[in-house]
UniProtKB/Swiss-Prot annotation:
Function: NAD-binding protein involved in the addition of a carboxymethylaminomethyl (cmnm) group at the wobble position (U34) of certain tRNAs, forming tRNA-cmnm(5)s(2)U34.
InterPro entries cross-referenced by the UniProt entry: FAD/NAD-bd_sf, GIDA_C_N, MnmG, MnmG-rel, MnmG-rel_CS, MnmG_C, MnmG_C_subdom, MnmG_C_subdom_sf
HAMAP family: MnmG_GidA
SUPFAM superfamilies for the chain: FAD/NAD(P)-binding domain
Lineage: superkingdom: Bacteria
Intracellular or extracellular location(s): Cytoplasm
Name this protein carries in UniProt: tRNA uridine 5-carboxymethylaminomethyl modification enzyme MnmG
Keywords for this protein: Cytoplasm, FAD, Flavoprotein, NAD, tRNA processing
Organism: Blochmanniella pennsylvanica (strain BPEN)
A Pfam family the protein falls into: GIDA_C_1st
Gene Ontology MF term list: flavin adenine dinucleotide binding
């Protein structure tokens, strides 16, 4: 039986990818259905209770700049906020927040339930309805219902044929304590010619606070002033702030782990999936870094109303009894009791090279993939993909062309280009080092890069748009004021200025030129009567300071970006057989026919595609009269 309503967009899965996908589609006024196996776990933090970090925080800011909900939800639920790399350059500074996982889940659910054009139904999708090579709906056998939709977004997380391992014991599941995972959807996708592989991730044990000796641990508090994640957020939204704590493993811990590797499913061959390189288990740490005598552990409270503490840094799939021994060997945890054991989980994912940069399948029209199903790891990577998939599923339902950001526009652009061009053989996570234009892709300017685009896409409401325009206007007005305001060697406050300078002022200088000096910042400048009154909005004055201090470097990078955009906008025919292009080696032809790059830029990033091959492609395009550029 078919549900009586036809949906523009159907989103399968209520994790971080699914919630952002559904919200994006609904904000674009598409009739949207979100199907989740459990409404009570919408926005659940399955692993560590935190949002952000290096590279990841940049993605969260971009999601927020485009009207997404992750940043605003963490502002309502964050119990410790810090800026990582705060002493380094602006490009690599990253916000991170410890979450009250209960408050976070409540915030996400509230946003979903009050979103217009969105219906949430609790059910399990186990099959797709496909007509020819086009998606037309989904099937929920246990509900006995079929749902028709113009487009479908799959955000299945680790629930796609998931298997949980604790020691030699394993069982079907996508998350410990949740319902069983299903292999039926995986099998259906395999029938449709999708390339399937296995990945592995893991989680750390949770312990009870009453057994922790906090007095022997180092506390780590929120920064002062406390950071805010959302561009429309405020510290007034933050709940009570509490510290995290730091301890370390030791030789005794390592010996316990080493002597029990024979009981580790990773080291006995039970687990076939590839683990994340940048989030290794404690078994991997001790094996790969055998010269280390200690590994850092962060004790992260899971909330203000729960006694659970997440032990970040010792992800493990060792037997429960071994985990207990291991925990009790660590300083401060000698009397700690495990509430939930750590575990490893294997799950299916599909080759993201079978996707367009819009995250639409190249195989089935109207079918979109986002999150861990594409081989990524992390809440932030999933949420960013969900946003993009939701945008494009909505545009597909309206017969509009898809949209995606370039590598020079957003970390999201880097993420999807990496996945769709190179694929991945291990869980992919974002780092600032993956972005060649990271000086232009800072956290602080995510809204300046993306909010206008999001407004055009229909994601930004009127109140948010007015706030953005006001901020942008204030930045320009203040820069203009600083540019036109001069201080002289004989000014009344020059002595105060000279206290800040390495060498005394000898000639008239305006505010912008003073800010270019490394020893001067906006706060110091605003102490001088010449440059009063100053802007109080932190977002505004920090943006002004960064723009001025990095102006020369940014200008140089913009020249590089212009060349990059030319190649990205030089399009290749979608139906081309590269055998007809003369001068290409067979290896190059095979790779180009396999990848089907959309542009010269994407072709140039495929491993083994030489500069000579790119030149041949450009010559061929010119001869065929196909040397056209996408002006989007």
């Amino acid at each position: 039986m078919f549900y009586p309503i036809h949906f523009d967009v159907i989103v399968v899965g209520g994790g971080h990818a699914g919630t952002e996908a559904a919200l994006a589609s609904a904000r674009m006024q598409c009739n949207t259905l979100l199907i989740t196996h459990n409404i009570d776990t919408l926005g659940q933090m399955s692993c560590n209770p935190a949002v952000g970090g290096i590279g990841k925080g940049h993605l969260v800011k971009e999601i927020d700049a485009m009207g997404g909900s992750m940043a605003y939800a963490i502002d309502q639920s964050g119990i410790q906020f810090r800026v990582l790399n705060s002493s380094k350059g602006a490009a690599v500074r990253a916000t991170r927040a410890q979450a009250d996982k209960i408050l976070y889940r409540q915030a996400i659910r509230s946003i979903l339930e009050y979103q217009k054009f969105l219906l949430v139904i609790q059910a399990s999708v186990e099959d797709l309805i496909v007509s020819g090579n086009k998606i037309v709906g989904v099937i929920t056998p246990k509900l006995g219902m079929k749902f028709s939709g113009t487009s479908v977004v799959l955000t299945t997380g680790t629930f796609l044929n998931g298997k949980i391992h604790i020691g030699m014991n394993n069982f079907r599941g996508g998350r410990s304590g949740d319902s069983e995972s299903s292999s039926l959807l995986s099998e259906r996708l395999k029938e449709l010619s999708f390339q399937i592989s296995r990945l592995k991730t893991g989680t750390s044990p949770r312990v009870h606070t009453k057994g922790i000796n906090f007095g022997s641990l180092r506390a780590q508090y929120s920064d002062d002033p406390i950071p805010v994640f959302s561009f429309i957020g405020s510290t007034k939204l933050h709940p009570t702030q509490v510290p995290c704590y730091i301890t370390h493993t030791n030789n005794k811990t390592h010996e316990i782990v080493r002597s029990n590797l024979y009981q580790s499913p990773m080291y006995t061959g039970l687990i076939k999936g590839i683990a994340p390189r940048y989030c290794p288990s404690i078994e991997d740490k001790i094996t790969r870094f055998s010269d280390r005598n200690a590994h850092q552990i962060f004790l992260e409270p899971e909330g203000l109303t729960t006694p659970e503490v997440y032990l970040n840094g010792i992800s493990t799939s060792l037997p429960f009894c071994v985990q207990m021994q291991m925990i009790k060997s660590i300083q401060g945890l000698e009397n700690a009791c495990i509430i939930r054991p750590g575990y490893a989980i294997e799950y299916d994912f599909f080759d993201p090279r079978d996707l367009k940069l819009t995250l639409e399948s190249k195989i089935i029209s109207g079918l979109f993939f986002s999150g861990q199903i594409n081989g990524t790891t992390g809440y932030e990577e999933a949420a960013a993909q969900g946003l993009l998939a939701g945008i494009n599923a909505a545009r597909f339902s309206k017969n509009k062309e898809g949209w995606y950001p370039r590598r020079d526009q957003a970390y999201l652009g880097v993420l999807v280009d990496d996945l769709c061009t190179h694929g991945t053989e291990e869980p992919y996570r974002m780092f600032t080092s993956r972005a060649e234009y990271r000086l232009s892709l800072r956290e602080d300017n995510a809204d300046l890069r993306l909010t206008e685009i999001a407004r055009q896409l229909g994601l930004i409401d009127e109140s948010r748009w007015k706030a953005f325009c006001c901020k942008k206007e204030n930045i320009e007005k203040e820069r203009q004021r600083l540019r036109n305001t001069y201080i002289f060697p004989y000014s009344s406050d020059v002595a105060q200025l000279n206290n800040f300078l390495k060498t005394p002022l000898t000639h008239e200088t305006n505010g912008e030129d003073l800010l270019r000096r490394p020893e001067i910042n906006y706060k110091k400048l605003s102490q001088l009567s010449t440059f009063s009154p100053s802007i109080l909005d932190r977002q505004v004055f920090e943006q002004i300071e960064i723009q001025i201090k990095y102006e020369g470097y940014i200008r140089h990078q913009q020249e590089e970006i212009k060349r990059h955009i030319y190649n990205e906008n030089t399009l290749l025919p979608t139906d081309i057989d590269f055998n007809i292009v003369s001068g290409l080696s067979q290896e190059v032809i095979d790779k180009l026919n396999n990848y089907k790059p959309y542009s010269i830029g994407q072709a140039s990033r495929i491993s083994g595609i030489t500069p000579a091959a790119i030149s041949n492609l450009l010559v061929w395009l010119k001869k065929q009269g196909l040397l056209e550029h996408n002006t989007c």
